[in-house]
Amino acid sequence: LQIKVYHGGSLGLKNEDVLRWLPTGAAEMGLVWANYLGRDAPAMNAVYIQGSVGSTEEHLKAIPVLKDIYAEELKEWGIVPAGFLALPILYASIFCRDEAVNTLEALRTKKLRVWSKDMVETFDKLGVSAQIIGQTEMYVALKTGVVDCAVYPALYAKTVSLQEVTGFASYLYPIAGLPYVLGASEQQWNSLPASMQ
């Protein structure tokens, strides 16, 4: 078995479209993150609402249930969960290009990048213009002014070079990181011998 790994987005396959391209075999495997699935699978997107779990203990109790839900839902899309990558409790901040944003009033004057439908709805109720932009498009969206600010875990900000396109950050809240699912096309998975699965 040979596995060739590609960086997210490098094949032109968008995170938010994974339920559409993975079953077709456009790539045999890919990371599935429920937060990006609000358009195609609203139930999966709503399994773990941002801010609903605030401690490591609560998070660890929820993970087995999340795995079961994911396996059941992904089966309907022709995707097999080959593995899960758990994330720790993270601390989201609002990273902004041109000025610090420390109040809701100031945030209402900005265009904000978020990663899930529930976040769009929450910020909309607060009078903030928010839109889902995938992680692989976030840097360019900030650089070109598509958005002024982005919600992102501070721990991982350097991995996507946010320091190059933003000069300010304000802490927002703790987030329980949804596990990534290493999903495989069911057709591709079933074609492998059991010893390779």
Residue ranges with predicted function:
Residues 1-58, 72-197:
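N-terminal secretory/targeting leader peptides
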